[in-house]
Swiss-Prot record:
PROSITE patterns on file: NA_SOLUT_SYMP_3
Stretches assigned to coiled coil: none
Cellular localization per UniProt: Apical cell membrane
Alphabetical list of InterPro entries matching this protein: Na/Glc_symporter_sf (IPR038377), Na/solute_symporter (IPR001734), SMCT2_SLC5sbd (IPR042700), Sodium:Solute_Symporter_SSF (IPR051163)
Transmembrane segments: 11-31, 51-71, 84-104, 130-150, 159-179, 182-202, 237-257, 277-297, 323-343, 387-407, 413-433, 439-459, 511-531
This protein's name: Sodium-coupled monocarboxylate transporter 2
Function field: Acts as an electroneutral and low-affinity sodium (Na(+))-dependent sodium-coupled solute transporter. Catalyzes the transport across the plasma membrane of many monocarboxylates such as lactate, pyruvate, nicotinate, propionate, butyrate and beta-D-hydroxybutyrate.
KW Chaperone (keyword) present: no
Gene that this polypeptide is encoded by: slc5a12
Segments in the Extracellular topological domain: 1-10, 72-83, 151-158, 203-236, 298-322, 408-412, 460-510
Example of a GO cellular component annotation carried by this entry: apical plasma membrane
Family: Belongs to the sodium:solute symporter (SSF) (TC 2.A.21) family.
Length: 623
């Protein structure tokens, strides 16, 4: 592989500024919050965050360096159909904001998995927490290693230096500043990501002959064929796999993921939390747009000489760094800006993961074993957990360098684990009659199905005709025949002992792994519940479940207010209302004209230990 340039002093300075500013934010909040010892202040920011920084933090955390580097390469090879993920993002944010968020926010919990104990039992909570910890450590390690390797091979940027710097800096500001430092650092890193992308878009389009030429070349090369309505689940990317499969995959990441919900419940009101999610949707669209256009510009620039097929680079993930070094290498500091852009995605993802891991470990294990810890002891333990998980994630990144092809399996863990856990929460929230046996049995079935298809796909790779990779041209390359490696070398070599499962079940699009786990969990959970005897929904206090009418009836909170006995307080301000009186005994009513109202319904007995059961009243309010 040839290199088009190496990092210069100016590039290292620009890149170092990212780490210095990120660390500085952690120091700032450590000093500012030094007299606030409670662990809740450290783990959820005192529940006083506003929607703006939380929205930026959410976007930055889930648009990792894998997106910054991998998405443009995907568009380069398979076309702009990747943009359909925007449809999936829309559904994901809606269901998170209207279905899952109200339940988590109003219950006053810190760990999302605490809900599972309130709804089912501690065993279910522990199982889901362990799944989350394993999946997050594994995925976070890969998120650190994969982009560092691609950048190292193209730019010469030090591999181990970047890995250890990422782990040390993230652990540093997470430990010092807690969630507030994570959120504000993510906000800064989101700005860096956008600036880095814009730099590539402006210079790249100029070098490719302008946007009009980019559009024309992309159309000629088939990159603008966005809508493929083939319903086959075996096709890698179609409208249905990206929109439906993408929705299930990202809903498992957003809807019930500790990292997302932790920042949402850190908001001062439920209204701020909702706004954070919807503003985050705008951020997701912006990053997605930048990634797709970058891929089209890159294809237009290399339309006559593909560097991957011609052997100039050894893997598709190196396309974006190679392109950046070629178009920005003559401008001191700009390659460093792009690397800062890529590592902003990595830093935000790793920091969010470390903070979330520390939270679930403390809430789901430490506080359960030692319920009488002082505030100061709890705060120090929370910080120690941040350090421990920072070391674990960095160690996982180092281990990824020795894993070879296992890295691909690790990147699929989110889908394989996220779907069954999403199904578990859906059983609890949407189906009030689901019993404990149904929840446990459904989770086992869902995990088994999703890992069956995921591991099977790793052992028996899907045939290349399922991916529909578009043609790449090397006619304009100034290379010798001996140096040329044809594109056909990348075609998956299929073994002769493949059985019928290999070409059907194991060849399913990776975006459906989460859907398989979700459907398996819900279907098995409901069947087992019906066979073993459904639970009486009256045994559950209101707030543990959420009906479809409540999800779709947007006026529910807007036209009601809570009387807490100490003055009126808007129901939209559930951060305070539910902290004092989380069980409001509210039942939604809808008349024949589809007008919503919320009637008070008091129930005696069958209380849930997770809620405070003082009386409240809900009254209709005309706006």
């Amino acid at each position: 592989m040839e290199t088009v340039g190496r990092f210069q002093a100016g590039d290292y300075v620009v890149f170092a500024c990212l780490f210095v500013v990120s660390s500085g934010i952690g120091v700032f909040f450590a000093i500012k919050e030094r007299n606030k010892a409670p662990s809740k202040e450290f783990l959820v920011g005192g529940r006083q965050m506003s929607c703006g920084p939380v929205a930026l933090s959410l976007t930055a955390s889930f648009m990792s360096a894998v997106t910054v580097i991998g998405a443009p390469a995907d568009v380069y090879r398979f076309g702009a159909s990747y943009v359909i993920f925007g449809v999936a993002y829309t559904f994901v944010v809606f269901f998170t904001a209207e279905l899952f968020l109200p339940v988590f926010y109003r219950s006053g919990i810190t760990s999302t998995y605490e809900y599972l104990e309130l709804r089912f039992c501690k065993l279910v909570r522990v199982a889901a927490t362990l799944i989350y910890i394993i999946q997050t450590i594994l995925y976070t390690g890969v998120v650190v290693y994969a982009p560092a390797l691609a950048l190292n091979q193209v730019t010469g940027f030090d591999l181990w230096g970047s890995i250890f710097a990422t782990g040390i800096v993230c652990t540093f500001y997470c430990t010092l500043g807690g969630l507030k430092a994570v959120v504000w650092t993510d906000a800064f890193q989101m700005v860096v990501m956008v600036v880095g992308f814009l730099t590539v878009l402006i210079q790249g389009s100029s070098r490719a002959g302008g946007i009009e030429n980019v559009w024309s070349t992309s159309r000629t090369g088939g990159r603008l064929q966005v809508f493929d309505f083939d319903v086959s689940p075996l096709r890698r990317h179609t409208f249905w796999t990206l929109s439906v499969g993408g929705t299930f995959t990202w809903l498992g990441i957003y809807g019930v993921n500790q990292s997302t919900i932790q920042r949402c419940i850190s908001c001062k009101t439920e209204g701020h939390a909702r706004w954070a999610l919807y503003l985050n949707l705008l951020g997701l669209w912006i990053i997605l747009f930048c990634a797709v256009v970058s891929g089209l510009i890159m294809y237009s620039y290399y339309s006559h000489c593909d560097p991957w097929s011609s052997g100039l680079i050894s893997a598709p993930d190196q396309l974006m760094p190679y392109f950046v070094m070629e178009i920005l290498g003559a401008f001191p500091g700009l390659p460093g800006l792009f690397v800062a852009c890529a590592f902003s995605g990595t830093l935000s993802t790793v920091a969010a993961s470390i903070n979330a891991l520390a939270t679930v470990m403390y809430e789901d294990f430490v506080s359960q074993c030692f319920p009488d810890l002082s505030n100061r002891a709890a705060s120090w333990i929370s910080k120690a957990l941040c350090v421990a998980f920072g070391v674990a994630c960095t160690t996982m990144a180092v281990a990824a360098s020795y894993m070879g092809g296992i890295v691909q399996a690790a990147l699929s863990i989110h889908g394989m684990c996220g779907g069954p856990v999403l199904g578990l929460f859906s059983l609890g929230i949407l189906f009030p009659f689901t019993n404990l046996k149904g929840a446990v049995g459904g989770l086992i079935v869902g995990i088994s199905l999703s890992f069956w298809v995921g591991v099977g796909a790793f052992i028996y790779p899907a045939p290349s005709n399922n991916t529909h990779a578009l043609e790449l041209n090397t006619a304009g390359c100034n290379i010798t025949a001996a140096a040329f490696e044809p594109t056909s070398a990348t075609v998956t070599q299929l073994t002769s002992d493949r059985n019928w499962l290999a070409d059907s079940w194991y060849s399913m699009s990776y975006l459906y792994y989460s859907a398989v786990g979700f459907i398996g969990t819900v279907a098995a959970g409901l069947l087992i519940t019906l066979l073993t005897g459904p639970m009486d929904p009256k045994l559950l206090k209101p707030g543990m479940t959420r009906s479809v009418k409540e999800v779709m009836c947007f006026c529910t909170e807007k036209f009601t207010e809570a009387d807490l006995g100490e003055g009126k307080e808007d129901v939209g301000d559930f951060g305070k209302a539910w902290e004092k009186h989380p069980d409001q005994g509210c039942t939604l009513r809808m008349d024949e004209k589809f007008r919503c109202s919320c009637d008070n319904q008091q129930e005696n007995g069958n209380t849930n230990a997770g809620f405070d059961h003082n009386e409240t009243s809900i009254v209709q309010k005309k706006l």
